[in-house]
Swiss-Prot record:
It comes from the Bacteria. This is Transcriptional activator protein CarR. Residues 162-227 form the HTH luxR-type domain. Pfam families: Autoind_bind, GerE. Keywords: Activator, Antibiotic biosynthesis, DNA-binding, Quorum sensing, Transcription, Transcription regulation. One of its GO terms (molecular function) is DNA binding. The gene is carR. Belongs to the autoinducer-regulated transcriptional regulatory protein family. It comes from Pectobacterium carotovorum subsp. carotovorum. One of its GO terms (biological process) is antibiotic biosynthetic process. Functions as an OHLL responsive transcriptional regulator which acts in the control of the biosynthesis of carbapenem antibiotics.
Length: 244
């Protein structure tokens, strides 16, 4: 997937010339290692990650407080660089000294950036960035959407949903739906379980919502398909019936 996204970014950046780029994504809630897709020199990327430079990188620090694109030569960036020169001094050794960064903050409290380095020292670089600002910002949005979708898919594989009876419906919801499926009225169910008819309807409505159907009949059909009326609920139901 990283290779696909790398190729996607590279293809979309053809219009702005032969540039180095870096997509960076990190949670604002933790200092865990960021997710990076880049064609920066490999030696620089290894040093950047090994020394955890992202924690003090002036570009990332600035991105945390901004929502609009910015040049690395902006006054506030220059000021941040002066306060923390280690990252800049190291990056210059790899021909990364000027560039432009696009910023995105998502609903999961992540910050994502698309940084484009002017490693060829093109005099028209900044003008080119400004001319393509909207397209490049949308590129960041599209890339970030792909990355998050990919990570969600991986997470779903690692943590598959629990489709057991108890994961879908509570024991009481299963009891109520089981009794209704056997042809009993809400009044009869309320008497068997010792609850009010209002509570019976409440549990039925919850079952309909959780099973993502439109009414109780459909809920019963889906519950049967999913084998939710498995034996665990039946002894409980029988206990209530015997107590009548």
């Amino acid at each position: 997937m990283d290779h696909e996204i790398h190729s996607f970014i590279k293809r979309k950046l053809k219009g702005v010339g032969d540039v180095w780029f870096s997509y960076f994504m990190m949670s604002k809630n933790s200092t865990s290692q960021p997710y990076i897709i880049s064609n920066y020199p490999e030696a620089w990327m290894k040093e950047y990650i090994k020394k955890e430079m992202f924690l003090s990188d002036p570009i990332i620090v600035a991105s945390l407080a901004r929502i609009t694109p910015f040049s690395w030569d902006d006054n506030d960036i220059v000021t941040l660089r002066a306060k923390n020169q280690d990252v800049f001094i190291s990056s210059v050794q790899h021909d990364i000294s000027s560039g432009y960064t696009f910023v995105l903050h998502d609903h999961d409290n992540n910050v994502a950036t698309l940084s484009i380095a002017n490693h060829l020292e093109d005099a028209n670089f900044e003008k080119c960035m400004k001319n393509h600002e909207n397209d490049l910002q949308m590129l960041l949005v599209n890339v970030h959407e792909k990355v998050m979708a990919y990570q969600r898919a991986i997470n779903d594989q690692d943590n598959p949903p629990d489709n057991s009876r108890n994961a879908l419906l509570s024991p009481r919801e299963t009891e109520v739906l089981f009794l209704v499926s056997s042809g009993r009225t809400y009044k009869e169910v309320s008497r068997i379980l010792g609850i009010s008819e209002v509570t019976v309807k409440f549990h039925i409505n919850n079952s309909v919502r959780k099973l993502d159907v439109i009414n109780s009949r459909h809920a019963i059909t889906k519950a049967l398909e999913l084998n939710l009326f498995h034996s665990p609920c039946e002894p409980v139901v029988m206990k209530h019936m015997d107590a009548r």
